[in-house]
A protein has these predicted regions:
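A structural boundary/capping signal
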Residues: 1-167
Length: 167
């Protein structure tokens, strides 16, 4: 495991829900990613994919999946550089475990996340009238952190598995 992977994994493991939140939610975002997530291999942006709008990772990743059905929307945590802190981020994968990120000007150093079906991404985006984080969906009461997170048949895209499971 690389130092960046160790840093990200330590962050994920430390993400236990506060006591007050446990009355409402089953898991934290970090716990969800740990339970359902995969490691992804960062690659250079393919020539046919344009750089997206800075700080609009969810929109950029959704646009890529809508434009190319072979790409799968992923959301989780990533580190832009070894020295940066983990942040919620969205990217696409090619079904081979690669992280394709058209938001950052260069690939991040490590990606850990969950692949979602295009149907789930589209329905959630339409419901919210915006491309926001599926994991941090406060507008709808964090559904993936509650009962919906226990029903992966409704959201998990198996074609988008990464290089190896996080746990």
């Amino acid at each position: 495991m690389t130092p960046s992977e160790t840093k990200l994994l330590s962050f994920l493991v430390s993400g236990e829900l506060p006591a007050a939140a446990k009355a409402v939610l089953k898991r934290s975002i970090q716990e969800f990613v740990l339970q359902c997530g995969w490691w992804y291999q960062p690659i250079e942006l393919p020539k046919q994919i344009a750089l997206g709008t800075p700080q609009e990772c969810h929109t950029n990743a959704i646009d890529l999946t809508l434009a190319d059905e072979t790409l799968i929307y992923c959301e989780g945590y990533a580190l832009f550089k070894d020295s940066s802190q983990p942040r919620i981020h969205a990217w696409v994968t090619d079904g081979k475990g690669n992280a394709i990120d058209n938001t950052w000007p260069q690939p991040g150093v490590v990606y850990a996340g969950v692949p979602f079906t295009l149907d789930f991404v589209t329905v959630t985006t339409l419901k919210n009238h915006a491309a926001i984080s599926l994991l941090d969906d406060f507008q709808n009461g964090f559904p993936l952190l509650g009962d919906l997170g226990d029903r992966p048949v409704e959201w998990l895209e198996l074609r988008g598995r990464g290089t190896k499971k996080l746990m």
